[in-house]
Amino acid sequence: ENLRTDVNWIRRLTIILENAKEMLDALVIDGELIYSQPDLRSKFNKQKFFDLDFYPVSLYYLGMTTLKDNYVMVLPNLTAQSIYMNYYNELNQISDDARCFVPAYRLFMDHRKLKPLVENYFKEYLGQFPAQVFDKINENFIRCSFYEVLSRYLSNCYTFAVEQNLPSGRADLVLTGISGTAFHNDCRVVEFKYFKAKDATMVEALKVVRPEDADQVRRYAADINRQFPAYRMRAYVVYIAAGKVCKTWEVINL
């Protein structure tokens, strides 16, 4: 919650709303901010703190980003990611009205099917964005925003991992049932594929999941199951083409 208040520093740093939006685009769409090593090493200067080129280092000083390597900064954890995503939604006037989401999640408690939750996200969350936004967003935005919506309603049932490192690669999203709940040992792996509007017709025409995508998520599920044999694994591939097409396949023969 302390970070929630500190996020208002973005407004102070960027001075105008458009600059704040650009900063958040970099954080929640690209997932990283380029920074200058000399700026990071330089002596603290209050005047420079509000300079446009110094924004990434200013956020680092405020504890709102962390260093990924010698060139870029990233958000420090999933809690920060969720908070920034909430702030992004506020700035872009994206509603989080529970009445649009709760019915789908109540049904999930009965049938445990993930596909309706993806469809709910596509309609009620992505459906609020203007068409031009879909040329800018990417798979990183899709996985992070879907996680943020899921975490509002399923955080008592699952823990979440975004871009989980596995021997076969990085899984976009992993849901793991919490011990002591009815979801214990229920593990879901979700792989997202995002397409621009020009590819919507191609995605719409797909009758089955592409074999290479199914194989990818199978490998991720196998990696997890080798480490945790008691898990009941389920795996999914989600195709989203701008705001036009959404298709979800559950991959079998894990």
What name fits each language-model region?
Residues 1-203, 209-213, 254:
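Extended alpha-helical interface modules used as scaffolds for assembling large macromolecular complexes
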Residues 205-251:
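Nucleic-acid nuclease catalytic cores
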